Design a protein with these regions (language model features):
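Disordered, low-complexity "stalk" and linker segments at domain junctions of extracellular
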Residues: 1-16
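Short, low-complexity intrinsically disordered segments
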Residues: 13, 32, 42, 93-95, ...
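Beta-sheet-dominated scaffold domains
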Residues: 17-18, 26, 53-164
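Beta-propeller blade signature
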Residues: 33-35, 163-164
Length: 164
């Protein structure tokens, strides 16, 4: 017997023939990331088919290698078999990521600047430190033979200035 998508699910993404839906539980500061049956996007087994992730999931971005999951505390990669922490800082709320269809990379506006996945790398640490904003809207824009990652921010947040 299967269940429908859990009520209260917010961030939703398709990856490798399944629907993923994040449901945040503020009392425990945990998110359940539910996944559907293969190609049964409306069928969920709520007893076994989920990942438990610390913090509030704010984004899920599909890549060939992994489903990249960004929370308010960390950035993770879920490969279908295992989940691992990519960064010990989170992402900015809003639409903080965009995909480059040419190289199939995902670009993410994080609490510490611009990151790329997969493989994961922070592209701005060591070069520039900016306030991350409190809300983000992002896109990869191709124009005039060039591509740019553009992010529009609601001002706020604190820049991370790493001590060396």
């Amino acid at each position: 017997d299967f269940d429908p998508i859990p009520t209260g699910s917010t961030v939703i993404q398709f990856w490798r023939g399944r629907l993923y839906a994040a449901q945040y539980f503020p009392g425990s500061d945990m998110t359940a990331v539910w996944h559907s049956q293969p190609l049964g996007f409306h069928l969920f087994d709520l007893t076994t088919d989920f990942l438990a992730i610390h913090g509030k999931v704010l984004m899920m971005a599909p890549t060939d290698e992994a489903l990249v999951i960004g929370t308010d505390k960390e950035i993770h990669a879920y490969t279908g078999d295992a989940i691992r922490v990519l960064a010990t800082y989170g992402v900015v709320p809003g639409w903080c990521w965009s995909r480059d269809d040419d190289d199939k990379s995902v670009y993410i506006w994080s609490q510490r600047g611009l990151c790329k996945a997969m493989p994961f790398a922070n592209l701005t640490s060591g070069h520039v430190s900016v306030a991350p904003g409190v809300q983000a809207g992002a896109a990869v824009v191709a124009q005039g033979g060039q591509k740019r990652f553009v992010v529009a921010l609601h001002a706020g947040g604190t820049a991370f200035n790493q001590r060396t």
